[in-house]
Curated annotation (Swiss-Prot):
One of its GO terms (molecular function) is quinone binding. The chain crosses the membrane at residues 12-32, 37-57, 70-90, 101-121, 124-144, 159-179, 199-219, 230-250, 266-286, 293-313, 321-341, 361-381, 393-413, 438-458. It comes from Thermodesulfovibrio yellowstonii (strain ATCC 51303 / DSM 11347 / YP87). GO terms for cellular component: plasma membrane. It catalyses: a quinone + NADH + 5 H(+)(in) = a quinol + NAD(+) + 4 H(+)(out). InterPro entries: NADH-Q_OxRdtase_suN/2, ND/Mrp_TM. This is NADH-quinone oxidoreductase subunit N 1. GO terms for biological process: ATP synthesis coupled electron transport.
Amino acid sequence: MNISQIPLQVEALIPEITLTGFASLILLAGLLKLKNEVLVWSSVLFLVIFAFFIPSFEGEAFNGMFLNDFLTIYLKLIIIIGTIISLLVLTSYLKEKLIRFNESIAFILFSALGMMLLVSARELISFFLSFELMSLSIYVLVGIRRYDVKSNEAAVKYFMLGGFSSAIMLFGIAFIYGATNTTELSLILKVISNYNPLILIGLGLFIVGLCFKIALVPFHMWAPDVYEGAPTPVTAFISTLPKVAILGAFGRVLVEIFRDYYIDWSNFLIVLSIATMATGNFFALIQKNIKRMLAYSSIAHAGYIIIGVIVGTQSGFNSVVAYMFIYTLMNIGAFAMVIAFNEESIENYKGLHKFHPALAIAMLIFMFSLTGVPPTAGFIVKFNIFLQAVKAGFTWLVVIAVIFTVISAYYYLRIVMYMYMKEPVKLPEPIYSRELEVAILICTIGVTFLGILPLFLI
């Protein structure tokens, strides 16, 4: 049978089906007692090859329940690149902490699978199930250090609050179904032209459930404790890629499907954006632990990113996608540096450039990019979001965001000042591994090169 004649058009989901099989094999590989390096590099090689073939699978699957178009494929490539870097970062940590490789790698792959399905979903039940596949895998990853109390506490807290947010989102889907008699987004678009309070309630609950995962204030309380308690590579993973998937899917649903309710959801998101930028930046100022500082920093960045969704145009949404790509590189890179330095106290970063100049330069680049200092890529994507907001008439919101960006410079550049302008108080013992060095190099080159030559970022 020709592949184009497969019932329900499953060929568009062949990449996801292949990834499911590979992740299952990695999970079973523990029985074969393969070398850890074999598991890691075979996974990386698989994902690299996987990325080359993904653009070949455009179209619909399962009668329109999933859609692969240019934007979806772009989001999937970001997820794959982030997953590759996360696997490389995870490797050195697993070696150091003696954690089982096959389980950690498999659950990262299953989580990435959920994210890829999420950005393709064009039906609310498929959206929810993809969301849960991503979430359940992450809960396991957060608690992968089985005998670490902080890791276990973080996993339980994340699981309990995550389950609560999923219930709220599912309740919202039920309201939308009750008002439209369908869960297919294409059909919902046809029947929501008349203003319906039931749809508005459902949409509000749906947004609240998703806001939990991207840590928008006031749904952020889990983030600092979970980010601090989780293994550092897992923190890097969950602080970036789930946001790519959720904002990619969530932003598109709002902009394309619920356009008639733009005033309602945009006003709600404006309040959340301002509260998120304020809370994230002000709490980051007082942190002494770099993982908690980066946790609050990621909350603040969620506030900036949402501005692109608030714009409500395709160009605004495109700026969100570009921001998420660069945010993935610079945030995973920053957490990779925390692993490399093997030190979480900000005080102990003093004078690092004297003993580890290459690592200090990489950290400087990531801090500059997170701040939005030119010519880093972080400046380009933040400027692009602000530009789209100004064009849409949200100049006042951009002014507020710029003020908070200036505030953020204090805690980011404090790290740089400590590394270059303070005398060392403690000599860290960096963790060196081939995989970690490759990950840091990829992130550093990406953030620097795409800042000088933005290419597709604008």
